[in-house]
Amino acid sequence: MDIIGGQHLRQMWDDLADVYGHKTALICESSGGVVNRYSYLELNQEINRTTNLFYTLGIRKGDKVALHLDNCPEFIFCWFGLAKIGAIMVPINARLLREESAWILQNSQACLLVTSAQFYPMYQQIQQEDATQLRHICLTDVALPADDGVSSFTQLKNQQPATLCYAPPLSTDDTAEILFTSGTTSRPKGVVITHYNLRFAGYYSAWQCALRDDDVYLTVMPAFHIDCQCTAAMAAFSAGATFVLVEKYSARAFWGQVQKYRATVTECIPMMIRTLMAQPPSANDRQHRLREVMFYLNLSEQEKDAFCERFGVRLLTSYGMTETIVGIIGDRPGDKRRWPSIGRAGFCYEAEIRDDHNRPLPAGEIGEICIKGVPGKTIFKEYFLNPKATAKVLEADGWLHTGDTGYCDEEGFFYFVDRRCNMIKRGGENVSCVELENIIATHPKIQDIVVVGIKDSIRDEAIKAFVVLNEGETLSEEEFFRFCEQNMAKFKVPSYLEIRKDLPRNCSGKIIRKNLK
């Protein structure tokens, strides 16, 4: 079944400009408070100018172009500008340092980079010291260094016509993007995403939160991440809604931005919810138009209830990963919600719980969450130049092994337990890090928490808790361990405690556990 009607991204934008014209498509707010607005017609023209810019720089169908940018209009221009010419976007996590950025450049075969002045010194060093195929760098800033092979993105773009000068044949099967996974435990892998994937993501995510053309979808998720692209941006544009892209998350500013732009849909991760709850309550907390708050794992029921009560919102749970493109398990529009379930499989997907021998398990038994989709259409196509890694997670018939553990009930509601790699083996027992973190997070003095397993010669692994306290609080080891003993089984109680100012996180808010010992 062809959900998208054979429509690639170039056709999508031409149609959107015709249908919605002067309706607001995109609003971008920078960290400095600068706001840029574009109608569907204006945004399509900016995308066309960007396509022409890339063509004048020698970019052709199949070429890879890296983007190392914070949330900004230029990211959107480049993303779809490359797609219109059949070239391939390689978004780089804006928080990555030299070694990781160089690795992605090398492994993606990117020949051109679009970035900003703050990241340029790093790429100067990469060009001098690392073997890459990089031929040219475009900077989004006005001021330019007097270096060869560097040009102004904005100046070049503004010199281009607003209609396409070059439009090669495109297919929905063409690769639109190679998105490298966050790599919290190992080197990132390049997830190959097609035009079909992105078009399907727009329709699916719009269905999931029942988007209409009068909706306003606001996000602070990074544009280089799958959530921003496929759950927010593609959904908003596919529905003809307004997409609000905020440069960076600020707990102090976020709720005001939701109110300012009259957002009807937004998305949150646990870190955002916890830091929002740490802000002083206001009489205006419930003065908003939010209909849905898309939510991604994982939160205790106490935290969820407190957040929903204070802000007068409800959470729409969505479970997925880069390889699934969208939240393939989640709450459905108009359907009942069953906390702490992560929901039921969405349309075009099947989901099962399987054992270590790849056999389906009955309701109530814990195993690996497996998803069936169509590679290159409803799930990712493959890992870039890595058939071995692809074969490890993706079966020939479209079953994807997520590496996550969970179970389902008799009505098809799924429940997330943990990442397999986050299960701690302690004296013959399997302990879920997420379960412990949800319990410990209910302590009134604790703002953030992660637990990890560390080697133990007697019990396989011991449990160590890393906590961040609320401002002005102190917490003794005696108080902490007493709380744990009162709220969890004895074998789950951590052996060690470390209080820190913050926890290492990647761009999507996930804890980088390999940095904690």
UniProtKB/Swiss-Prot annotation:
It is an enzyme of class 6 (ligase). Pathway: Amine and polyamine metabolism; carnitine metabolism. GO terms for molecular function: carnitine-CoA ligase activity; crotonobetaine-CoA ligase activity; medium-chain fatty acid-CoA ligase activity. InterPro entries: AMP-bd_C (IPR025110), AMP-bd_C_sf (IPR045851), AMP-binding_CS (IPR020845), AMP-dep_synth/lig_dom (IPR000873), ANL_N_sf (IPR042099), CaiC (IPR023456). It comes from the Bacteria. The keyword RNA-binding does not apply. GO terms for biological process: carnitine metabolic process; fatty acid metabolic process. Belongs to the ATP-dependent AMP-binding enzyme family. This is Crotonobetaine/carnitine--CoA ligase. It comes from Shigella sonnei (strain Ss046). The gene is caiC.
